[in-house]
Each structure stands twice: as structure tokens, then as C-alpha cells.
């Protein structure tokens, strides 16, 4: 008894934190895990990068109209994007996880039903054979008993079932919510555009007011298409399909680029033409995604009561709080930089945009991690969960190291591309060490968002982000007052470091959805 007790006492307990380094030497391996991650991440990253590129071209066309029109479009887009960001992030994140989970569960049910059906047919055939062989009253004992002929109709039915549309309740729910949120956003922006422009500093007598009001009001008409298309992108991500959204995004951006000069210059609609071109492209993207999705999914659920509005609302409010916390930290940092003067603000804005560029690349890994992990958690395939989670984090960190070198050298030698002002360039040089050195931290923080969303750990991510924001807000205010421009970047470094630490805490401690990391060795002894 004593020896057995000693043996049990000496069993090594697993250390959850070490799972992060699982198969580290295979981080660049093109194995099944690596191919699956990159197959989702690469198209997702391209789709995310396509919009900013199209926006730059769009801005170039508007810039030819004059400085007033360009400024009007800039402030209008800032308002539109800020209003959209609040709803887009929760909607897309929840849709991806929920659809991946439900789709996986439905596939598991289908496989179980098929297995049960095959088992029942096998028993029936065996029973028929036994009866045929053992029956003494058989009319023709010389002829061997043949098993029942296969049902060709059944086989053809099975082939058609493979192409049968799926009923995914969360997909239908997400689309309805996307349309409703888009309509609400459109109405809000149309009727409050002048008020919002005033809040952004556009005065009643400003020459920007009229063109900005017209542009924002027309762009608002595209909000329903934008939110609905993003809901459908979340659905495709849940199916682990990021190529279809990439195709739709590229087509829409090309349409926008082609229509811009036609509406702006040929039809002489000016800034209004730019807005119309963008709205048309949004509706084209929605139509493309809708057509592809209609081939896969029954968009109208059999029963309205099957829709999961409550689940979306509960978790959506949590992610809304998280989004507000993230936005507030970055907005406060910009506000503190603005208080330092025009030159520090200009340098800060350039540095901030470069600092956050890594999110476009890492969001691709985050999307891949979220989709695969949501499926794996639904299957309770914890070996795959650990393999995928560790791999995307390792890939994110390596990508961050590469970005650190690229961004550091790029800003050092290419600062003149962003500004010709020596004072601005000098302040940018001060910020370069922070921007470059924090790229691996940023990468981990962004990828961890996808990992935690894949685990459906929405409550933790929301509450932890609010806590991070509270500390970071205090740090931004204090450091900006005491250390000026450098202080703001120190505070932002603290902010991203806290995001990464809290993001990895659940996995590293084996808590929440990651409890299985601690209980793996104990299962054998129980």
C-alpha cells in the first residue's frame, strides 16, 4: 500500500504552460496542422489587406477633387468606421465560433446516424443469412442464399444527401442580426450625421460640413450590406472557408475602383459619386456571398423558435464591452498625444498606424485558430486543440519577430515617406524602438484573441480586457503627463503586454476551457 501511494505521489503533474512550446521544432513544418492553418490564414489575411489597399486608391481619386473634399471624406470615414467597429467585431467573432461549433456537431450527428444505419443493416443481413442457412423448410436447399440486393435508390439518395443543404441555426440568426444592426446603423448615421460631424470638430461654418454630410449620409445606406456581408463572412469562416470571402472582397474592391473615376469625374458627381461607388460595391459583395452561401445552407430556418438570439445577445454584450475598452485605450492615447501639440500628434498618428499594421497579418492566424479550435472543442479532440493552439501562437510570435525587424528598419530609413517635417521625423525616431520591439507582443495578443474565441471563452476575454483597460488608462494619463511622447508609448507597451499576459493566462494555468490540460494524466488513475 505504501509503495503504491509513493508511486502515485511521484506521478508528474502536467504543466499547462509548457503546451505553448509543444512541437516547437515543427513551427515551419508543412504537416497536416500547418497546412490547415495556413490554408485558412493566408486567404483571410489577403482579404483583410485588400480593403485598406482599395481605400488608398479611393482616397487618391477623392484627393484630386481638392483638400476640402479629401478632409471631408476622411472625417466621414472615421465616423462610419467607428460606428461599424462597435458591432462588426462582436458579430463576426461570435458567428465564426457558433457556426463552427454547430456545423461540427451536425456533422458528428450525421456520422453517428450513418454508423447506426450501417450497423443495423449488417445485423439484418447476418440475421437473414442465418435464417436462410438454418431453415429446414427451405424450398431449395441446393441454391445458396444470396444477401439482399443493394438498394440502388438508397445509394442514389445517399449521393444526393452529400450535396444536401445544411440547416445551421446560428447562421440564420447571424444574418438576421447583421441586417437589423445594419439598418439601425444606417438610420442612426443618416439622422445624426451633422451632430456627429460637430463632435468630430467640423464647425457649422466649415466648408467641410456640406460635402462631409452628403458623403456620410450616402455611405450610411451601405451599412445594411456591410453588416450582412460581414455576418456571412463569419459564417464562411465557421465553415473554415476563407477563399470565398476573399473572392467576394476582391471583386467588390475592383468594382469600387472601376466605378470611382466614372462617378467622380465622368458623371461629375464628385464626392457624392465616390460614396455611391462604395455603396454599390458593398451590395455586390453581399450578393456574391449570399449566392455562394445559399448553395450550402438553408438560409430560412424550419422554425423561427430555433434561432439563437439570446445566445448572440448575451455573448455579444460581453464582446461589445471588450471592444469599447480596446477602442477607449487607443482613443485616449491619441487624445493625450494631441494635447502635446500638432507635431507630437502627427508623429504619434503615423507611429500608431504602423504599430497596428501587424494586426492585419496576425488576424489571419487568429481567424484560422478560432475556426479550427471551435470545431476541435466541439469534437472534444483535445490533442488537436493543443496542437493547433500551440502552432498558431508559435507562428504568431515568429511573424512578430519578422515584423519587428521589417518595421524597425522600414521606419528608420523610410520615415521621410510619411513626413518631411524634421520635428515629426525626430519624434518618430524616438518611437521606433517601442514600435519595433513590441511587434512580437502585439502578434501574440492578436492571435490569442482568436485562440480564446475558438474556446468560446467570451466572458473571460471581456472581463480581462476591461481590467487591462482600467490599468492602461491610468498608465496613459500618468505617463503622458510625466514623460510626454515617450510616456504614451511606454503606456501602450504596458497595455499590449497586459493583453498578451491575460490572453495566455487561461491556457498557461489550465483553467476555464483549458482544464483538460491539467487533468490529462489523472484520467488514467481515476
From Swiss-Prot:
Listed Pfam families: MatE
Region of interest (Disordered), ranges: 133-166
Location, primary (coarse class): membrane
Expressed in which tissues: Expressed in roots in the pericycle and cells internal to the pericycle and surrounding the vascular tissue. Also expressed in seed and flower.
Record InterPro entries: DinF-like, MATE_fam
Cellular compartments per GO CC: plasma membrane
Cytoplasmic side: 1-36, 81-170, 237-244, 294-316, 375-396, 448-457, 506-526
Localisation: Cell membrane
Key words, A-Z: Cell membrane, Ion channel, Ion transport, Membrane, Transmembrane, Transmembrane helix, Transport
Disruption phenotype annotation: Chlorotic. Constitutive expression of strategy I iron deficiency response and accumulation of iron, manganese and zinc in shoots. No reduction in aluminum tolerance. Accumulation of Mn, Cu, Zn and Mg in leaves and accumulation of Fe in roots. Altered pollen development.
Membrane spanning stretches: 37-57, 60-80, 171-191, 216-236, 245-267, 271-293, 317-337, 354-374, 397-417, 427-447, 458-478, 485-505
GO molecular function, one term: citrate transmembrane transporter activity
Composition bias, Polar residues: 134-144
Membrane topology: Multi-pass membrane protein
CDD domains reported in the protein's UniProt record: MATE_DinF_like
Biological process according to GO: cellular response to phosphate starvation; intracellular iron ion homeostasis; metal ion transport; response to abscisic acid
Induction, per UniProt: Two-fold induction by iron deficiency. Not induced by aluminum. Induced by abscisic acid (ABA).
Extracellular-facing ranges: 58-59, 192-215, 268-270, 338-353, 418-426, 479-484
Function description: Citrate transporter responsible for loading citrate into xylem tissues, which helps facilitate iron transport to shoots. Mediates the citrate release in the apoplastic spaces during plant development allowing iron nutrition between symplastically disconnected tissues.
Similarity comment text for this entry: Belongs to the multi antimicrobial extrusion (MATE) (TC 2.A.66.1) family.
NCBIfam families hit by this protein: matE (TIGR00797)
Protein name in UniProt: Protein DETOXIFICATION 43
Species lineage: Eukaryota, Viridiplantae, Streptophyta, Embryophyta, Tracheophyta
Name of the gene this protein is made from: DTX43
Amino acid at each position: 500500500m505504501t509503495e503504491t501511494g509513493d508511486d502515485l505521489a511521484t506521478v508528474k503533474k502536467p504543466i499547462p504552460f509548457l503546451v505553448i512550446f509543444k512541437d516547437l521544432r515543427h513551427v515551419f513544418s508543412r504537416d497536416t496542422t500547418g497546412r490547415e492553418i495556413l490554408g485558412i490564414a493566408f486567404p483571410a489575411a489577403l482579404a483583410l489587406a485588400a480593403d485598406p489597399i482599395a481605400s488608398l486608391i479611393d482616397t487618391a481619386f477623392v484627393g484630386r477633387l481638392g483638400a476640402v473634399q479629401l478632409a471631408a471624406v476622411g472625417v466621414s470615414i472615421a465616423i462610419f468606421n467607428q460606428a461599424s467597429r462597435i458591432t462588426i467585431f462582436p458579430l463576426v467573432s461570435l458567428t465564426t465560433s457558433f457556426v463552427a461549433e454547430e456545423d461540427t456537431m451536425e456533422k458528428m450527428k450525421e456520422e453517428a446516424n450513418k454508423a447506426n444505419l450501417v450497423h443495423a443493416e449488417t445485423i439484418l443481413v447476418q440475421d437473414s443469412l442465418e435464417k436462410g442457412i438454418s431453415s429446414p423448410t427451405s424450398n431449395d436447399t441446393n441454391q445458396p442464399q444470396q444477401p439482399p440486393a443493394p438498394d440502388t435508390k438508397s445509394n442514389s439518395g445517399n449521393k444526393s444527401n452529400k450535396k444536401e443543404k445544411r440547416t445551421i441555426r446560428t447562421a440564420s440568426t447571424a444574418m438576421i442580426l447583421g441586417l437589423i444592426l445594419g439598418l439601425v446603423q444606417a438610420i442612426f448615421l443618416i439622422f445624426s450625421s451633422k451632430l456627429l460631424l460637430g463632435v468630430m470638430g467640423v464647425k457649422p461654418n466649415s466648408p467641410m460640413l456640406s460635402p462631409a454630410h452628403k458623403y456620410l449620409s450616402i455611405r450610411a445606406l451601405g451599412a445594411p450590406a456591410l453588416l450582412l456581408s460581414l455576418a456571412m463572412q463569419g459564417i464562411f469562416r465557421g465553415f473554415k472557408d476563407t477563399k470565398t470571402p476573399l473572392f467576394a472582397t476582391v471583386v467588390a474592391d475592383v468594382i469600387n475602383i472601376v466605378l470611382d473615376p466614372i462617378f467622380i469625374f465622368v458623371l461629375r458627381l464628385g464626392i457624392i459619386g465616390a460614396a455611391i461607388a462604395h455603396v454599390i460595391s458593398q451590395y455586390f459583395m453581399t450578393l456574391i456571398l449570399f449566392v455562394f452561401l445559399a448553395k450550402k445552407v438553408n438560409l430560412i430556418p424550419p422554425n423561427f423558435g430555433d434561432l439563437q438570439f439570446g445566445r448572440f445577445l448575451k455573448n455579444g454584450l460581453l464582446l461589445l464591452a471588450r471592444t469599447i475598452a480596446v477602442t477607449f485605450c487607443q482613443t485616449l492615447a491619441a487624445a493625450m498625444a494631441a494635447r502635446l501639440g500638432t507635431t507630437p500628434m502627427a508623429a504619434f498618428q503615423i507611429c500608431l498606424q504602423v504599430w497596428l499594421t501587424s494586426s492585419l497579418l496576425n488576424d489571419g492566424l487568429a481567424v484560422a485558430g478560432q475556426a479550427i479550435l471551435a470545431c476541435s472543442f466541439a469534437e472534444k479532440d483535445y490533442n488537436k486543440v493543443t496542437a493547433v493552439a500551440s502552432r498558431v501562437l508559435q507562428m504568431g510570435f515568429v511573424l512578430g519577430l519578422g515584423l519587428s525587424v521589417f518595421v524597425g528598419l522600414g521606419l528608420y530609413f523610410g520615415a521621410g515617406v510619411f513626413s518631411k517635417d524634421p520635428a515629426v521625423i525626430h519624434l518618430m525616431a524616438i518611437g521606433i524602438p517601442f514600435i519595433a520591439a513590441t511587434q512580437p507582443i502585439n502578434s501574440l495578443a492578436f492571435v490569442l484573441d482568436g485562440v480564446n474565441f475558438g474556446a468560446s471563452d467570451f466572458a473571460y476575454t471581456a472581463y480581462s480586457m476591461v481590467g487591462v483597460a482600467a490599468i492602461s488608462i491610468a498608465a496613459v494619463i500618468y505617463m503622458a503627463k510625466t514623460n510626454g511622447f515617450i510616456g504614451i508609448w511606454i503606456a501602450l507597451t504596458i497595455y499590449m503586454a497586459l493583453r498578451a499576459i491575460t490572453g495566455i493566462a487561461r491556457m498557461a494555468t489550465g483553467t476555464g476551457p483549458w482544464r483538460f490540460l491539467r487533468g490529462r494524466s489523472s484520467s488514467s488513475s481515476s
